[in-house]
């Protein structure tokens, strides 16, 4: 028995046959002009979490790169955005992680974000110069830890690969020192956008006592439909 699900590709287009926990809070978007569709897609609450953090990280690191404002103001802005992102993550993902029995992943990410926030604020307000000079390294490292935990918890190869991407990006920042905040923002926000737009691999679905028998049966049928769709698409 393999640790990862070999029948699942690392990434692929989203499948329409969603489980109960994915249908909860599903957001569908369709933008069109007349009969011409500009964009059509759907986002589960997990996808919405990725989008939220993508906006937060882009806002933080692009502001640091392009706007000549004081470190104190930036610390306040970063703290506010990070707290909003952490709270939004908890609200959006709580039901999903409980059904999938991976609540510890949510707690892990919350701890990592708060740790990063405290260290960042201390580097600015307490004058921790060593930390201040390596804020990009810090956040890439913390994110890598979070992705590794997520990859192990969900048995997902893509999260482990993204974790490695963040980790190996740290030494590369020395080559783009004048643009390290922009580079960090692109890496972090880009990976989050990728995860929100595509379907990623994870372990096979599990039953949970939180769901009724009807919901469990619905999930089994959806799983069979996804497998059939994947087989026909080959």
Description of each model-found segment:
Residues 58-65, 115-126, 146-148, 166-178:
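Hydrophobic alpha-helical transmembrane segments and adjacent interfacial helices
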Residues 65-78, 125-135, 175-184:
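Membrane-helix interface and helix-disruption motif detector
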Residues 56-60, 85-88, 143-146, 169, ...:
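Membrane-embedded alpha-helical transmembrane segments of multi-pass integral membrane proteins
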Residues 102-163:
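Membrane-proximal helix-loop-helix units in multi-pass membrane proteins
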Residues 35-117:
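Selected alpha-helical membrane-embedding segments in polytopic membrane proteins
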Residues 52, 135-142, 184-187:
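Physicochemical signature of membrane-embedded alpha-helices that form the seven-helix bundle of GPCRs
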């Amino acid at each position: 028995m393999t640790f990862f699900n070999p029948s699942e590709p690392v990434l692929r287009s989203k499948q329409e046959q969603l489980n109960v926990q994915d249908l909860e809070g599903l957001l569908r978007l369709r933008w069109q002009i007349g009969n011409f569709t500009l964009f059509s897609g759907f986002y589960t609450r997990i996808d919405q979490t990725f989008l939220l953090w993508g906006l937060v990280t882009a806002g933080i690191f692009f502001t640091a790169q392009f706007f000549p404002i004081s470190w104190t103001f930036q610390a306040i802005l970063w703290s506010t955005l990070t707290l909003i992102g952490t709270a939004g993550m908890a609200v959006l993902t709580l039901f999903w992680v409980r059904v999938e029995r991976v609540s510890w992943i949510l707690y892990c990410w919350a701890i990592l974000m708060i740790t990063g926030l405290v260290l960042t604020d201390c580097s600015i307000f307490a004058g921790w110069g060593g930390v201040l000079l390596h804020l990009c390294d810090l956040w890439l490292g913390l994110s890598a830890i979070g992705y590794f935990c997520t990859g192990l918890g969900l048995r997902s190869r893509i999260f482990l690969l993204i974790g490695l991407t963040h980790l190996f990006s740290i030494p590369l920042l020395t080559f783009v020192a004048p643009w390290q905040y922009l580079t960090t923002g692109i890496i972090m926000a880009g990976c989050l956008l990728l995860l929100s737009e595509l379907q990623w691999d994870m372990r096979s679905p599990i039953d949970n006592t939180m769901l009724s028998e009807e919901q469990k049966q619905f999930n089994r049928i959806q799983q069979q439909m996804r497998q059939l769709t994947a087989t026909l698409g080959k």
